Amino acid sequence: MKKGINRVVLVGTGAVGCSYAYCMINQAVAEEFVLVDVNEAKAEGEAMDLSHAVPFAPAPTRVWKGSYEDCKDADLVVITAGLPQKPGETRLDLVEKNAKIFKQIVRSIMDSGFDGIFLIATNPVDILTYVTWKESGLPKERVIGSGTTLDSARFRYMLGEYFDIGPHNIHAYIIGEHGDTELPVWSHVSVGIQKLQTLLEKDNTYNQEDLDKIFINVRDAAYHIIERKGATYYGIGMSLLRVTKAILNDENSVLTVSAYLEGQYGQKDVYIGVPAVLNRGGVREILEVELSEDEELKFDHSVQVLKETMAPVL
């Protein structure tokens, strides 16, 4: 790693990976950006195309098609490789197929001498982040999954539409599995500086029934998009960019990534979406917010589902 030069390696140049790559070049987040794919011609073509966008970016980025050897000097390796989710298929259905692929990828990366941070996006992301941690031998703080960052963004966007407030001023989180057992933390939602419950009590224009429908749309958003266009990639591309910036810029920002629990929320030995402080070292700390009794039960269920699904592939 050259002094003052950030290098990010992307493994997987499918729709998600390339959406992330375009975001990275567009915002000039790193000085060096390397694309790695089993289809080397595809990776080379994407690198060429992205390079031609560099003159329009706010700062130059050197982009090239590389190999696992380029991970040796990387600050961050982002993995989006793997089989995509098909219509009607849950994220957990992918576990055995993608776990096998991941073990090979992670071993190849570690053989290069990589000693940076992993950011995982491939589904089922919580389980594959755990697999990456186990295979890599890196500290848990430096293996991170995209978790429920996208779900939380969808949640804020849809709540913003409902309340006619910009999503940046909606403070709301989805936690748990990035999938069917995720849950909204209603007890900590605020619109601007006003708590959600206070707003509901003051204005009967809004009601919990509508809010419950919003969450269902958040939870099932990927299914709706996949039915219509075959895959989701813009939202997750921006989510990965946001996590990348939090890490490389040493922001100490709070994002709901997939992080390793060792007692927080009463759970151990699982990667799952929770609010965490991210900086140059990875996960600085996990923020343990007080959940309602119902939220606790749903979170515990989410953990249990992940552990049961994960057991056969470890």
From Swiss-Prot:
EC number: 1.1.1.27
GO molecular function: L-lactate dehydrogenase activity
Residue numbers binding substrate: Q85, R91, N123, P124, V125, D126, D151, S152, A153, R154, T232
Activity modulation notes: Allosterically activated by fructose 1,6-bisphosphate (FBP).
Positions of NAD(+) binding: V16, D37, K42, Y68, G82, L83, A121, T122, N123, S146
Record family assignment: Belongs to the LDH/MDH superfamily. LDH family.
Highest taxon listed in the record's lineage: Bacteria
Role summary: Catalyzes the conversion of lactate to pyruvate.
Phosphotyrosine: residues bearing it: Y223
InterPro entries from the UniProt entry: L-lactate/malate_DH (IPR001557), L-lactate_DH (IPR011304), L-lactate_DH_AS (IPR018177), Lactate/malate_DH_C (IPR022383), Lactate/malate_DH_N (IPR001236), Lactate_DH/Glyco_Ohase_4_C (IPR015955), NAD(P)-bd_dom_sf (IPR036291)
SUPFAM superfamilies associated with the record: LDH C-terminal domain-like, NAD(P)-binding Rossmann-fold domains
GO biological process, alphabetically ordered: glycolytic process; lactate metabolic process; pyruvate metabolic process
GO CC, any one term: cytoplasm
Official protein name in the record: L-lactate dehydrogenase 1
Organism name: Bacillus cereus (strain ATCC 14579 / DSM 31 / CCUG 7414 / JCM 2152 / NBRC 15305 / NCIMB 9373 / NCTC 2599 / NRRL B-3711)
Pfam families noted in UniProt: Ldh_1_C, Ldh_1_N
The reaction(s) this protein catalyses: (S)-lactate + NAD(+) = pyruvate + NADH + H(+)
